[in-house]
Amino acid sequence: MRGPADLDAALERVARAQADALFVLPDDPALHNLRVRLVARVNALRLPSLFGMREFVDEGGLMSYGERFADTYRQAALYVTKLTRGTNPAELPIEQPTHFELVINLRTAAALGLTIPRPVLLRASATVR
């Protein structure tokens, strides 16, 4: 998908391929802006979906697993503070996310006729009802 105009065609290809599920990576800002439309279309196709950002689950997507972006933004703010106070950028370590969350939308699971196994529910950071 190159942009928002390609969303419908991309989902039509997924439907024609008779996909069993859909995984949407968190690296495309255009998809984040289209999340309401994307989730509605995916659910209309009755495709279980896994997203990289919680906001998709809050809009009705089935599940998300990914970093907590609020933590990432806080860390970026700390870097900016250090840089504006004169820290040499070469002295700052490269950091990776350390907190990840699994969020499950139980309403969507029920609508899709899916039962989420108890061990998966126990590992969830949050559920949407």
Put a short name on every predicted segment.
Residues 1-129:
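Short hydrophobic alpha-helices and adjacent helix-cap/hinge residues
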